[in-house]
Amino acid sequence: MPLCSLENRHLALTVSSSGGTILQLSARRSGGDFPLLRPAMLSDETPAAQSACFPLVPFGNRLKGNTFSFEGKTYRLSPNTADAHYLHGDGWLAEWDCIFQGTESLTLAFEHHSDSYCYRAEQRFLLAGDRLEVTMTVTNLADYALPFGLGWHPFFPLTASARLQAVASGYWQEEAQCVAGKHHQNLPADLDFCTSQPLPRRWVNNGFSGWNGSADIVWPDAGQQLRLTTQPACPVYFLFMSDTRFDPGYQHDFFCIEPMTHAANDHHLPGGGSLTVLSPGAHLTQQMSLQCIALCGDEHA
C-alpha cells in the first residue's frame, strides 16, 4: 500500500506508507474541492518534508546536543537528516505497513529499534463526517523506561486572507540552529493569536505554551474554515513560517501549526517537562481532528 485514498461526501484523503504521511486532504465542494492541507505530489516517492502532514514520534522537534540523561543513563541520538540535530523523530523517515483498510478508515504501523528508543507506532485515519480523525499510539518495546511524546507536522495553505486563532500564554525563543531556548510570558503582537489574526510574513519557528488544544484557521477568500482539535488537549503548538533564506524555493504558500504533547527540548527540563515516561510495554495515545467548516453564506459550499 504505497498510497491509499479514502473519501466521503465531505472529505477526500490520500495517505502514503512512506513516512506515514498525508499527501492530500480536501473539502469536497460543488464548486471545486478546497485543499485543507498543502497539496503534495501524489507519489510514494514524495518525501515527508514535501507532504501535507507527517507524524512526530517518539517525540517532536529538536533535542539540544542530541543527548539526554534519564534515570542515570545518557542517551545519544544521531542526526537523521542534513540538519545538525536528530529531527522530528523516526516515523516521518520510516516505511509504514498498512495493517487495516476499510472504506472510510485505515491503520498504518511501524517498529523502530535502536540503542535508545525501541517502540511500535500506529496511526489510524478515520473519516467521520466532516472530520478527519488521526489517532496515534506509541508502545515502548524496550526493556527499560524512556520519555515519549507525540505530535503532527501539518502544512496549511497560506493565502492572502488566511487567519489563525490559537490560545497561548507564552512562547519559547528560538536559539541558534533552530533549538528552543528561553520561555517568555509576553507574546509579540504579531504572534498573539488568542483572537483571530493574519499570519506574519516573516520567519517564525517557535513553540507556544498554555494552549487549549484547539485552533481555527479561516480562509475568508475561499469561504472555508478548518478547526483543529486534539484529545487529550495538547498543551503546546509549534508555529512555523519559512523564508527564502531557509528554503530558496519557498513561495509563501504554506504555514505549519504543529500540535504536540510536549515542548521542544523537554528532555532537558526537570522531570522531562510534558514528556510521558513509558515503562516497558506501556503506551501513549494522542488524537488530532481536522474538521472542515463552510463559512455561513458561502456560495461555494
Q: What is each of the regions a protein language model found here?
A:
Residues 7, 73, 78-129:
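Extended, loop-rich substrate-binding clefts of extracytoplasmic carbohydrate-active enzymes
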Residues 14-74, 80:
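Acidic-aromatic substrate-binding/catalytic surfaces of carbohydrate-active enzymes
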Residues 15, 108-110, 125, 228, ...:
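Short, hydrophobic/aromatic-enriched beta-strand segments in well-ordered soluble domains
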Residues 68-76, 136, 276-294:
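Short Pro-Gly-centered flexible turn/kink motifs
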Residues 76, 155-233, 300:
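Active-site/ligand-binding surface loops and adjacent short beta/alpha elements
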Residues 85-99, 163-164, 199-273:
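Acidic/His-leaning functional-site neighborhoods
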Residues 110-158:
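Acidic, contiguous internal or C-terminal segments within carbohydrate-active enzymes
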Residues 122-124, 273-278:
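Beta-strand-rich interaction surfaces with strong enrichment in secreted/lumenal proteins
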